[in-house]
Amino acid sequence: MIIDTTEVQAINSFFRLESLKEVYDIIWMLVPILTLVLGITIGVLVIVWLEREISAGIQQRIGPEYAGPLGILQALADGTKLLFKENLLPSRGDTRLFSIGPSIAVTSILLSYLVIPFGYRLVLADVSIGVFLWIAISSIAPVGLLMSGYGSNNKYSFLGGLRAAAQSISYEIPLTLCVLSISLLSNSSSTVDIVEAQSKYGFWGWNLWRQPIGFIVFLISSLAECERLPFDLPEAEEELVAGYQTEYSGIKFGLFYVASYLNLLVSSLFVTVLYLGGWNLSLPHIALPFFFEINKAGRVFGTIIGIFITLAKTYLFLFIAITTRWTLPRLRMDQLLNLGWKFLLPISLGNLLLTTSSQLLSL
């Protein structure tokens, strides 16, 4: 009887330890995800504030100044306002598609952050097809916009959804061809490998210098994918009121608002990763990675430096995107499609052909 009791106690202790280990593993898995979500949230708030301040400077007016110091809490005030607004549904629309559309758009963009390396060994999912996984995931977002436009039962919303789908298809192909050229140069489709392939010669090792044509095409295609001026035809106020967002209010409208900035941040991060060397300091002949690997404190410091460098390069592209918004006029729909199919697609195909030829000759 004593032996049986001892065995039962040992088994119970073993199961308790196993349960604690499972809980610990779950917590350890959730910590980086929650940290990434917190970082993304802060990044979006900073982008909104920067856009308001830069736009005010370009237009020679005063930007937000009442919501917190220097108006830095303006985005938080806007989000709170949208959160407490009434959530209206169209009486004759498809309420299921109407409600699911914004969620699909936001979720597909959020999943793109899984393959982005923010620093040395700081990525949630280092998969061998990282860049193409991003393209596949981001291709789902236009489906959500089309569902939103169709479910609204509004001609302006439906036309805006159709424009969003057509625009995404037109510019997704040149963007994919540019990414394929980068993969050929790096001999890998992993985002981490692409960054490390640019670290050999510092600043001169960036793909920006080896792929200048691809960089310009990728830049234009990224702006078009984000539906930023001069490519904001799905939301053209003068023609479509607000496009696929016309019938939305409250938190659902806020989701579209967040999705646009999330997409802009994703595009900026991928410009940094694919063309600007990612987390690398970009100074040749300086063995900083070796210095950062000396001890644990060095690794932590190196990770922080890498995150700072990545974000600095990212916000440089964001500044260009925001400045472009107030510099160039909106294109017509035919001009937008002609630019994508008649100019960017042949140029990106030619760039891919040149890259493939150079790689074959170097073998």
UniProtKB/Swiss-Prot annotation:
It comes from the Eukaryota. One of its GO terms (molecular function) is NADH dehydrogenase activity. GO terms for cellular component: chloroplast thylakoid membrane. It is an enzyme of class 7 (translocase). It catalyses: a plastoquinone + NADH + (n+1) H(+)(in) = a plastoquinol + NAD(+) + n H(+)(out); a plastoquinone + NADPH + (n+1) H(+)(in) = a plastoquinol + NADP(+) + n H(+)(out). GO terms for biological process: aerobic respiration; photosynthesis, light reaction. Keywords: Chloroplast, Membrane, NAD, NADP, Plastid, Plastoquinone, Quinone, Thylakoid, Translocase, Transmembrane, Transmembrane helix. The chain crosses the membrane at residues 30-50, 98-118, 127-147, 253-273, 300-320, 336-356. It is a multi-pass membrane protein. Its EC number is 7.1.1.-. InterPro entries: NADH_UbQ_OxRdtase_su1/FPO, NADH_UbQ_OxRdtase_su1_CS. Its main location: plastid. It is found in: Plastid, Chloroplast thylakoid membrane. Belongs to the complex I subunit 1 family. NDH is composed of at least 16 different subunits, 5 of which are encoded in the nucleus. NDH shuttles electrons from NAD(P)H:plastoquinone, via FMN and iron-sulfur (Fe-S) centers, to quinones in the photosynthetic chain and possibly in a chloroplast respiratory chain. The immediate electron acceptor for the enzyme in this species is believed to be plastoquinone. Couples the redox reaction to proton translocation, and thus conserves the redox energy in a proton gradient. NCBIfam families: PRK06076.1-2. This is NAD(P)H-quinone oxidoreductase subunit 1, chloroplastic. It comes from Daucus carota.
